[in-house]
From Swiss-Prot:
Polar residues: bias regions: 82-94, 152-173, 282-291
EC number from the UniProt entry: 3.6.4.12
Composition skew (Low complexity), residue ranges: 558-568, 643-657
Compositional bias per record (Acidic residues), positions renumbered to this chain: 569-583, 694-705, 1543-1552
Protein name in the entry: Helicase SWR1
GO BP: any one term: chromatin remodeling
Species of origin: Kluyveromyces lactis (strain ATCC 8585 / CBS 2359 / DSM 70799 / NBRC 1267 / NRRL Y-1140 / WM37) (Yeast)
Catalytic activities: ATP + H2O = ADP + phosphate + H(+)
């Protein structure tokens, strides 16, 4: 029978378990029991997790224990189940099902008791005193109110649960122990009365030990407690008997002496075992609730608080000791071996009595410490632990589970908000123990504070009112005085404003006076400048007349004279007055006896005959002594002007810079003007007449026809520095006038004399090079510096070397000379010296700093070297070493790169200690006249005047003012425009100023000595495709918006696209390669599918309606197709059936002999065997009879006609194979293709728009829809077809892919059409051509074009290596079979000399026309023997023609000033969109808006607009040039335009125009000197 269980006691135990776990969870979560509700049954997930993590969950412990049972117990249970003796497993599972309703009932009873106690407490009188707190409790500590509250629920059976928020606890283990200790202390305190109170939060339950009712109730309950104690014991024993788990656990507990049960803390040490939980709960109840020997009544419970002190050292009661299991004591008996004593000293006295005491003497820590240190450390740790515990209780610190650390609370966490209620300052037990007196006193204190605050506020208000009244009366008392002060202050402000206005007015008047004064000074300076210019022209005319007297002492052969005269005649016919001015002497009639401009104008208006009659008396002066003295005086004047180069260069430079930087200065000093060349001119009329006479007698002209051995008194033509005249006037004047040649004895020592060719020079000089040597020698003789500005390719290097050789041979001046050149031509100069003048000691100064230091060692010794060649970069870097050495000649190659006079390089070179200076440049004029002035000032920086003052060559502002505006006017209006007199005079004066210091000869000047150069512009019409693409691009809305936007980058991109269209349409839009559109299925497939579908539907029931001819015997049988009559007869005769018949009869006889068995008996094996044998024989007999029947049937078949008759009467297709028509129609496929090859080549030109992929399979019949062949046959045929070569490959390729015809490459482009004609003419006449283009892709098109026409060509572009260029050029020059050399204008110019070609073709023009100029010089240079023709292709009515028109205007500027041929891309800053597009430009684009305002980023922007290959080629070309540019790069500010200052002056004049009478009075007052 099942044991009888005490369910009531088990329910109480369950209730106690739930109360304890709930309290434990509350303490763990909130660290105190404030607001703790004992009736709250927590079912939250956090509560369940808490129990499971700490092994306090009963259900999970039972499940785990069941899983951990041993195999023996399982076998025992299984045996009990089988035998039926064991109880059903449902008893175990239904324990909690029966207990839980009783637990709910216990909760409801407890709730009723609490409610009744609360109601009785409310009826008590207020006079009852509250029992004081026992002495063992801690002092009152203010505990802050928790921030968060958990809502708990008071649970009753059948009622809802009300939840409260409770504070969180940090240390569950410590709180549990403290709870048990506090229970024991409280039980000890209340042991005399046995009164247990129930605590709750709202309302708090008060202690009733002092009331009589409480005493009587306690006595009644004491007897009940004893009886219930015995009941609890009996019920506990009963539960243990009924529950095998508890019983086993108790046995386990007794067996394990180490298993203790300490104050309920075993709930945390049970390792999730439910049996231990129940056992521990029983022992916990006994030890915690019954410390005095009595059992607590079920009606009331006492719950402890964590705020009470711990008392771990109190002895346990007898009951507690009984409840604890006995401990096993282990005693260790160690029998130590006896000591071997050989000496009395070996006897050791034991320090410890036993091993245990010895082991206890060791105290282990992280470090080895003594016992005293260990004890002190333990005390400190206990003190620290106590402080931590107190901190936890008082809320000063908290535990952070995330970081596993203790954290202190900050003041902000502890202090409540200002508007919040004050926190509870006492514990939850003590906050309800205030008496009425306490409340009364507190209320009195509060009211007292309120009265004091009210009193203070009223006093403050009264004080504030008194202050307001006092201030009011003070304000009334000082009103008069304040009014006087305000009036005085107002008057002062008015006086100050009036004074400031007057001062401002006088300041403006002072500025106006300074401006007017400056205008007067400027006007005076202009007058003085004109005076200085006139005097400078006189000096220039005198110097030039002396230089150009070379024919008086020159003994040229007659051929040279004829060539010179022929050259002069050509110049006269061309009407180039500038070249005539350069080759002829200029009369000094520009400066008359008074030296004024009016006289100059009168002389310029006279004809040559009138001038001759006017100055006829000057030709009669023959006094040689006077001429010698005058020439000596002139020489002394010139020497004095040119030798004083040491004092005032800095003054002049600083003066010019100060004028540029500070344009608004109060006063501007007088500029020296051009007095550098004319300071020592005598103003006496007689001297001037003598000078003019001298010039007239000694002047000479190179360009006239005449024989030196002819008439002695014939004088040469002398052209005045008058404005350019028409061609007819020049011809008439030159034909009518002749002058006599002066004798050599009367030659001026300053004149240019013919010098011998130095013996050190190897090689032969050309005539113009010999004239250049004479000019350079005259500069040295006259102690003058100069600029050799011959065009590139005329041999400036050899002329310079010949000058140095002349100085060494004739003047015995061996240097040292300094030659500064760009880095790229440094070695080239050294090689030229070794080639033409090997007698010089040349020092090439380059290398690392150490190498240069080695080269400088000993260079101060005499004749250490004769010539030093270095680069601009190194000469500036080592300028201190070069400045210490005295140089005879300083020669600067490519001197136009020092055009910036503000740069440190210009100033450093200017200060070198040199006797003479020579500048070599091919492009002396760049963008403005300021750069030309910088070169001239570099030659003559300082000049001495008569009065001892020193001044520079000329002021930059004056130079710009004299020549800048008239020259700009000529460029803007054009060369053919009729110029006014002032402009003509200015240009003539500029020529006169430049002529003494500049020798400039173009290739056209020496065309008799060099092959001619002819430029042709070929205008090409656009093809139809080009015109369509060009117009389409221009008509796009996006293009119009881009051009109207004014964005330079967008406009350049548009221009680049237009240039691509002009060069070739394939650059803009490639002609496509057409292919057929390929689809998978053909049209026939869909038709066949539809046809098959319709056919199948129509013949769906054909077998039902059709007639079978075979059944009607209207068809030949199969015997007639296979058998003949003879075969059928022979088969019937030869059939073999006898063996089969014999075997059949034998088997039948055998079967008849045996008695048949109808029903076999399976019990008899013999009878069953005979039955099976009989059946087997019958089966064989049936098979043999069927075989005999089939044999007879097949052998006895007879055909109706026989196959022999059918074949005889049938006409087959093989009979037509051998006929001639059949042989023609069945030719092989290869034969057909070969025969039709010509047709295929001619007519297979149209690519079908669409092709299909299934035509081949359909033609063969192996497509999917064809049922003619089986699938295996189809696969076999397809594999065989794929392995065969396709005979239609060529035809299919021509029909599927349509490549553009090669001839379209030429006919799509107008330039290539013209080029084809031009190349054909050139090749027929034996010419060779260079074709230049800017774009690399055009070179690819040109390659295709030349390959199409079969020309032999070579190619050189930016990708060609530098070392390969020389190989290509040498091969082209040496191999006449190569007709064309195509080059990129960006391929660089170092080491390229293509004199083997005599034709240059510019397919397109470069952005920078200087590149085109350099490309021309590769062919037209020294070494060329034939005339060079230059063809420039320009697309008509396009952007190219407009760009060329604007570029020619820039070229004309060079012809006006110095006749140079170089210009840069700065014309983009001058052009507008309408200038480039012409009539095709949109109407809404402004006319005068330039493309680009700033030129700094022009090259970068152009590179971005070009293709990547072209940009790379340009970059590589610039990288080569960059070696030279690094020598000339300077971070200084560029020279300012001269026009800017003049514009500022005009603006300043307009600013002060139109003054009132007051302002006029003020200005007069200042002017009279009364202001200062």
């Amino acid at each position: 029978m099942p044991e009888v269980r005490d369910w009531r006691q088990l329910a109480k135990t369950r209730l106690e378990y739930e109360l304890l776990t709930n309290e434990l969870f509350h303490l763990w979560e909130f660290t105190s029991l404030v607001e703790y509700d004992p009736l709250f049954r927590n079912t939250s997930n956090s509560f369940k997790t808490f129990l499971q993590e700490r092994g306090l969950d009963v259900e999970s412990s039972l499940e785990q224990d069941d899983m951990k049972e041993s195999n023996a117990s399982r076998r025992l249970k299984r045996r009990n189940v089988i035998s039926g003796t064991a109880d059903s497993s449902s008893d175990k599972n239904n324990i909690w099902g029966q207990v839980m309703p009783l637990v709910d009932q216990e909760y409801s009873e407890l709730q009723e008791k609490l409610r009744a106690s609360v109601c009785g407490r409310r009826g008590r009188k207020r006079t009852q005193q509250v029992a004081s707190v026992p002495a063992e409790s801690e002092e009152d500590v203010a505990v802050p109110r928790p921030n968060k509250k958990r809502q708990t629920v008071v649970t009753a059976q059948g009622s809802a649960q009300n939840k409260l928020n409770t504070p969180v606890v940090s240390s569950p283990k410590k709180s549990l122990k403290q709870t048990a200790d506090k229970k024991s202390k409280l039980n000890k305190r209340d042991s005399s009365t046995n009164d247990i109170s129930v605590e709750s939060e709202d309302p708090p339950v008060k202690d009733i030990t002092n009331t009589g009712q409480g005493k009587s109730k306690a006595r009644l309950k004491s007897s009940k407690a004893k009886s219930k104690k015995r009941a609890v014991k009996s019920q506990t024993e009963l539960v243990r008997k009924q529950s095998p788990e508890i019983k086993n656990e108790s046995k386990r507990t007794k067996a394990d002496p180490t298993h203790t049960n300490d104050d309920g803390n075993d709930n945390r040490k049970t390792n999730n075992k439910s049996k231990n939980i129940i056992n521990n709960n029983e022992s916990g109840l006994k030890t915690s609730l019954n410390t005095t020997g009595d059992i607590i009544d079920d009606e009331e419970y006492y719950f402890t608080s964590s705020s009470e002190d711990d008392d771990n050292e109190k002895p346990r009661t007898a009951l507690q000791k009984k409840s604890l299991p006995n401990r096993l004591k282990v005693k260790l008996h160690v029998n130590a071996p006896r000591q071997t004593i050989t000496n009395p000293l070996h006897v050791l006295k034991p320090e410890y009595a036993d091993v245990h005491s010895f082991l206890q003497s060791y105290k282990s820590l992280d470090e080895d410490v003594s016992l005293e240190e260990y004890d002190s450390y333990i005390k400190e740790q206990r003190k620290t632990a106590k402080l931590i515990r107190i901190g936890f209780e008082r809320g000063a610190i908290k535990y952070d589970p995330q970081t596993d650390s203790l954290q202190s609370l900050s003041l902000r966490d502890v202090m409540p908000p200002s508007n919040a209620a004050e926190p509870i300052s006492v514990y939850y037990k003590e906050q309800s123990k205030h008496t009425f007196q306490d409340h009364l006193v507190n209320q009195g204190i509060v009211l007292s504070k309120s009265f004091q605050d009210s009193r203070r506020s009223q006093i403050a208000k009264a004080r504030r009112v008194a202050q307001i009244i006092e201030s009011h009366f003070k304000h009334i008392a000082g009103a008069e005085e304040r009014k006087l002060k305000e009036e005085e202050k107002r008057k002062k402000n008015l006086a100050r404003f009036a004074m400031q206005a007057v001062k401002k007015r006088w300041t403006m008047a002072e500025k106006a006076y300074k401006v007017l004064k400056k205008d007067e000074l400027d006007q005076l300076e202009r007058i003085q400048g004109k005076q200085h210019l006139t005097e400078m022209l006189e000096q220039s005319t005198q110097l030039l007349g002396a230089q150009l007297n070379q024919l008086d002492s020159c003994t040229y052969p007659s051929e040279a004279s004829d060539a010179s005269s022929e050259f002069s005649a050509n110049e006269e016919s061309d009407g180039n007055s500038d070249i005539d001015d350069e080759m002829m002497s200029t009369s000094s009639c520009d400066s008359d006896k008074e030296g004024n401009t009016e006289r100059i104008g009168n002389d310029m208006e006279l004809s040559v005959e009138e001038l001759r009659s006017k100055y006829a008396q000057l030709n009669k002066i023959n006094d040689f002594g006077n001429e010698t003295s005058k020439s000596a005086a002139d020489e002394s004047i010139f020497d004095e002007a040119s030798d004083s180069v040491s004092d005032s260069m800095e003054d002049s430079l600083s003066s010019s810079e100060s004028e540029t930087e500070d344009a608004d200065a109060s006063a501007q000093e007088d500029t020296p003007g051009l007095s550098a060349l004319l300071g020592n001119i005598d103003e006496n009329e007689e001297d001037v007449e003598a000078d003019v006479n001298f010039d007239a007698d000694s002047s000479s002209d190179d360009g006239l026809d005449g024989d030196s051995s002819g008439a002695e008194n014939n004088s040469k033509t002398e052209e005045l520095p008058s404005p350019p005249k028409s061609d007819n006037e020049l011809k008439d004047e030159k034909a009518e006038t002749t002058e006599s040649v002066t004798s050599p004895a009367a030659a001026d020592p300053l004149a240019v004399s013919d010098v011998p060719v130095p013996s050190l020079l190897r090689g032969t000089l050309r005539i113009y090079q010999k004239q250049g040597l004479n000019w350079l020698a005259s500069l040295y003789n006259n102690k003058t510096n100069g600029i050799l500005a011959d065009e590139m390719g005329l041999g400036k290097t050899i002329q310079t070397i010949s000058l140095l050789a002349y100085l060494a041979c004739e003047k015995e001046n061996w240097g040292p000379h300094l030659i500064v050149v760009p880095t790229s031509v440094l070695l080239n100069w050294e090689m030229e010296f070794k080639r033409f003048a090997p007698g010089f000691k040349v020092l090439t100064y380059y290398g690392s700093p150490q190498q240069r230091r080695e080269k400088r060692k000993g260079w101060n010794k005499p004749d250490a070297f004769h010539v030093c060649i270095t680069s601009y970069q190194l000469v500036v870097h080592d300028q201190h070493s070069f400045k210490r050495k005295k140089w005879q000649y300083m020669i600067l190659d490519e001197a136009h790169n020092i055009k910036n006079f503000r740069s440190t390089r210009w100033q450093a070179l200017l200060n070198f200690n040199t006797e003479r200076r020579l500048l070599l440049t091919g492009t002396p004029l760049q963008n403005n006249l300021a750069e030309l002035w910088s070169l001239l000032y570099f030659l003559m920086p300082q000049t001495a005047l008569e009065n001892g003052k020193v001044s520079g060559f000329a002021d930059l502002d004056a130079f710009q003012q004299w020549f800048g505006r008239p020259v700009d006017k000529i460029v803007e209006t054009g060369e053919n425009y009729e110029q006014d007199e002032e402009t003509k005079k200015t240009v003539s004066k500029l020529h006169q100023v430049l002529r003494p210091y500049l020798l400039r000869r173009l290739k056209a000047d020496v065309e008799k000595q060099m092959p001619g150069k002819y430029e042709h512009i070929i205008y090409c019409r656009l093809s139809k495709r080009q015109r369509f693409l060009y117009d389409d691009f221009m008509s796009r809305a996006q293009t119009k918006e881009t051009l109207a936007s004014g964005n330079f980058m967008s406009i350049i991109n548009c221009l680049m696209q237009l240039r691509k269209v002009c060069n070739h349409p394939d650059l803009f839009e490639v002609r496509p390669i057409l292919t057929s559109f390929c689809i998978e299925d053909s049209v026939s497939k869909s038709y066949c599918d539809l046809n098959n579908y319709v056919y199948n539907r129509l013949h769906e029931n054909q077998f039902e309606t059709s007639v079978d001819l075979s059944n009607l015997n209207f068809q030949f049988t199969s015997n007639d197709k296979t058998l003949s009559t003879n075969h059928s007869e022979k088969i019937s005769e030869l059939q073999c059936v006898q063996p089969i018949l014999k075997e059949i009869s034998r088997l039948k006889q055998l079967n008849e002999n045996d008695s048949p068995v109808t029903q076999p008996d399976f019990q008899d094996l013999n009878q069953y065997y005979s039955y099976a044998k009989h059946n087997k024989i019958n089966e064989i007999i049936g098979q043999l009879e069927h075989l005999n029947y089939m044999n007879n049937l097949r052998c006895n078949r007879r055909p109706m006609y026989g196959s022999n008759i059918v074949k005889l009467l049938t006409v087959g297709p093989k009979k037509f194979i051998d006929c001639e028509l059949t042989q023609e129609s069945i030719k092989p496929l290869e034969t057909r293709l070969l025969e039709g090859k010509e047709t295929i080549e001619k007519f297979a030109v149209i690519t079908p728009p669409v092709v299909t992929l299934d035509i081949r399979e359909r033609a063969v019949g192996v497509d999917d829809n064809n049922k003619r062949f089986e699938e295996s046959v189809k696969h076999h045929l397809v594999s065989q077809m794929r392995s065969l070569e396709n005979p239609f490959h060529q035809l299919q390729t021509k029909l599927s892919v349509a490549f553009p015809d090669k001839s379209l490459l030429q006919y799509d482009c107008g330039k290539l059409q013209k080029l084809a004609q031009l190349l054909q003419n050139l090749k027929d006449n034996g010419h060779r051509a260079l074709i230049f283009t800017q774009m690399t892709k055009v070179l690819d098109i040109l390659e295709q074009f030349l390959n199409f026409h079969g020309y032999l060509y070579m190619r050189l572009d930016g990708a060609t290596k530098i070392e390969d260029r020389q190989i290509l050029t040498e091969r082209f020059n040496s191999d006449p079979r190569i007709t064309v050399f195509i080059l990129s204008s960006r391929s660089g110019g170092l080491g390229i000399n293509l004199t083997g070609a005599d034709t240059v073709i510019f397919y397109d023009s470069d952005w920078n026309p200087a590149m085109d100029k350099q490309c021309q010089d590769r062919c037209h240079r020294i070494g060329q023997t034939r005339d060079v023709h230059i063809y420039r292709f320009v697309s008509d009515h396009t952007i190219e023609s407009n760009i060329l028109k604007k570029a020619n205007q820039k070229r004309h500027l060079d012809n006006v000033v110095i006749q140079t041929g170089d210009f840069t891309t700065d014309y983009f800053t001058k052009l507008s969109v309408k200038d480039l597009l012409g009539a095709e430009a949109p109407e809404d684009i402004p006319d005068d808006k330039p493309l680009l305002q700033d030129q700094k980023n022009l090259n970068k922007l152009l590179a971005q607009a070009e293709d990547e290959d072209d940009a790379k080629a340009a970059k590589s070309a610039l990288r080569e040039v960059n070696v030279d540019n690094e020598d000339f790069q300077e971070g200084s500010v560029a020279a300012q335009d001269g026009n800017s200052d003049n514009e500022n002056n005009e603006d300043s004049e307009d600013e002060y125009g139109g003054t009132s009478h007051v302002e006029e009075y003020m200005v007069r007052f200042i002017a009279n000197g009364f202001y200062y």
